Amino acid sequence: PKGLSTMKFILIMKICSALSGNCLPEHNGGVHNSWYDCAAAGSLNTLNAMAELGKEDVNKRKLFVTFKCDPVLGA
């Protein structure tokens, strides 16, 4: 559909612990011009976040990163 090409998407990321079942508050990963751009940024940001958290902490606390791309209403 033609209208979807102009829709923008906001990247929402979250770090969670499978050990505790808790998650940190959602983080705004910015607005992207397409679903593809948002999903690609989410994938890259997930890898970067894992690297920043570090292997030891990720393993110890069973951390994982999730993301979603929500449409920006009115954009």
Could you tell me what each predicted segment is?
Residues 1-6:
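Short, Lys/Arg-enriched N-terminal segments with co-localized hydrophobic residues
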Residues 8-20:
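Hydrophobic alpha-helical targeting segments used for export or membrane insertion
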Residues 9, 23-27, 53-59:
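Short, intrinsically disordered, charge-biased short linear motifs at domain edges
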Residues 23-37:
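A short, exposed loop/beta-hairpin motif centered on an aromatic-Gly-Thr core
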Residues 34-46:
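Short, well-ordered alpha-helical segments
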Residues 44, 48-75:
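Short, mixed-charge low-complexity intrinsically disordered segments
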